[in-house]
């Protein structure tokens, strides 16, 4: 009893024991006959039947066959693309495959649709010729008064245009051709008496000699324009100064804009210009200092910075001295220190001027309580490039200065 209960029905056991279901002929099944499909297709009784059911079966078979063929083709293309990516990289492999025709561009497939879009974008890029042959040839007509570009004339007159331009126009879209013609040097309007780069290169050594002559002999108009540009620069940098004063300073500096700016800055250019006699005095001082520059450069070693009237006095001072000392406090004449208060220089400008870059920016010290027992060497004895102006100013007889801050501060004459 227990064995009979555990045993299943005989039909299920027989179905499980048998082999899997074999495919049957669909045409025979439509007509009520069951026949195995293996070896039956050629001998089927209804293989040429045109009834509705058999026609539907034939259409279904055709669609399935097309899908299988498409999947096989896509799988083959993916394998080829994967191999090319391993060999040449991602983008280069796809571009090389598309160029060689291994993979035709398909708009409905993402990988190869990007390749086709890249090829279209490359065709629309404007192309430029380094040495256009149309410029070298003398077949180009002179520019008309209307100012039309050469590309319009070449389009209207087919006999005038060069074959290179026609070949370039054939490869690409019309929009790309118009952009390439507009951006190319061929399309720029030619003025009367103006030479193109192609004509200049075709002239040879004669044109080179003429260019050298032009460079060696500058025209007076170019010199005048350069001088005007220098004065304009000075007027823009110093709008509060008069133009005549700036012209005097520029002439004294040999028409050097940088040197003129340094002269004006060192003579109080940042402050507002003085009125009356003091303004003329400042202009005369700037002009004299600019004229003294060639003589000083001829006698002494060449220096990149101009020598101002107060430059030597400033260079002989120690870094520990006050930036703007009171001259009567040191017992000296107020007029002996030219960079005093009459020029309107504040300690900030004195510390960051062109000739005091070697001085450290610090608060002024009082000279009464700064270690009076120590004798400081003058700054000329130190090997600072910004402080050394002339080696002849060194103390030959005294190795150290007699005073605390040097001869100029202590109002002692310098021994030569």
UniProtKB/Swiss-Prot annotation:
Subcellular location(s): the record lists: Nucleus
- Name any one GO molecular function: RNA polymerase II cis-regulatory region sequence-specific DNA binding
Name the principal localization, coarsely classed.
Answer: nucleus
All residue ranges annotated as the DMA domain in the record: 228-263
Bias type Low complexity, positions: 133-145, 198-208
Q: Does the keyword Nucleus apply?
A: yes
**A cellular component term, taken from the record's GO annotations:** nucleus
Q: In terms of domain of life, where is this protein from?
A: Eukaryota
**GO biological process: one example:** regulation of transcription by RNA polymerase II
Which InterPro entries has this protein been placed in? Answer: DM_DNA-bd (IPR001275), DM_DNA-bd_sf (IPR036407), DMA (IPR005173), DMRT (IPR026607), DMRT5_1_DMB_dom (IPR046472), UBA-like_sf (IPR009060)
| Pfam families associated with the record | DM, DMA, DMRT5_DMB
Write the record's keywords in alphabetical order, separated by commas. DNA-binding, Metal-binding, Nucleus, Zinc
Any idea which residues the entry calls the DNA-binding region?
Answer: 25-72
User: What are the start and end residues of every segment in region (Disordered)?
Assistant: 133-226
Q: Which family does it belong to?
A: Belongs to the DMRT family.
Described by its record, this protein's role is as follows: May be involved in sexual development.
Q: What is the protein name stated in its UniProt record?
A: Doublesex- and mab-3-related transcription factor A2
What is the protein's species of origin?
Answer: Oryzias latipes
Organism taxonomic ancestry? Eukaryota, Metazoa, Chordata, Craniata, Vertebrata
């Amino acid at each position: 009893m227990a064995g009979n209960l555990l045993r299943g029905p005989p039909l299920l056991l027989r179905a499980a024991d048998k082999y899997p279901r074999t495919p049957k002929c669909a045409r025979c099944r439509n007509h009520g006959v069951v026949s195995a499909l293996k070896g039956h297709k050629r001998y089927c009784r209804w293989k040429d039947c045109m009834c509705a059911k058999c026609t539907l079966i034939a259409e279904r078979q055709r669609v399935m066959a097309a899908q299988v063929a498409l999947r096989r083709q896509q799988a083959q293309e993916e394998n080829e693309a994967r191999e090319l990516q391993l060999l040449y990289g991602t983008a280069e492999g796809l571009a090389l495959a598309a160029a060689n025709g291994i993979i035709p561009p398909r708009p409905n497939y993402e990988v190869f649709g990007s390749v086709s879009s890249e090829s279209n974008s490359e065709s629309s890029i404007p192309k430029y010729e380094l040495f256009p042959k149309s410029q070298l040839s003398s077949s180009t007509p002179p520019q008309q008064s209307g100012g039309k570009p050469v590309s319009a004339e070449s389009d209207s007159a087919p006999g005038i245009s060069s074959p290179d331009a026609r070949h370039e126009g054939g490869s690409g879209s019309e929009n790309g051709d118009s952009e390439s013609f507009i951006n190319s040097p061929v399309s720029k309007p030619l003025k009367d008496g103006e030479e193109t780069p192609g004509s200049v290169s075709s002239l040879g050594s004669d044109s080179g000699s003429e260019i050298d002559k032009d460079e060696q002999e500058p025209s007076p108009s170019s010199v005048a324009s350069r001088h005007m540009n220098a004065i304009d620069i000075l007027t823009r940098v110093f709008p509060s100064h008069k133009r005549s004063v700036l012209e005097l300073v520029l002439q004294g500096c040999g028409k050097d804009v940088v040197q003129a700016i340094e002269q004006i800055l060192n003579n109080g250019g940042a402050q507002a210009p003085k009125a009356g006699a003091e303004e003329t005095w400042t202009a005369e001082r700037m002009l004299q200092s600019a004229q003294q520059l060639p003589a000083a450069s001829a006698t002494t070693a060449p220096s990149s910075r101009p020598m101002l009237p107060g430059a030597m006095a400033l260079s002989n001072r120690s870094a520990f001295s006050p930036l703007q000392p009171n001259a009567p406090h040191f017992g000296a004449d107020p007029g002996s220190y030219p960079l005093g208060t009459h020029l309107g220089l504040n300690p900030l400008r004195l510390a960051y001027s062109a000739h005091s870059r070697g001085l450290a920016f610090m608060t002024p010290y009082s000279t009464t309580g700064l270690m009076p027992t120590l004798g400081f060497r003058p700054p000329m004895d130190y090997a600072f490039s910004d402080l050394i102006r002339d080696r002849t100013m060194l103390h030959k007889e005294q190795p150290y200065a007699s005073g605390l801050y040097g001869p100029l501060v202590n109002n002692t004459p310098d021994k030569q």
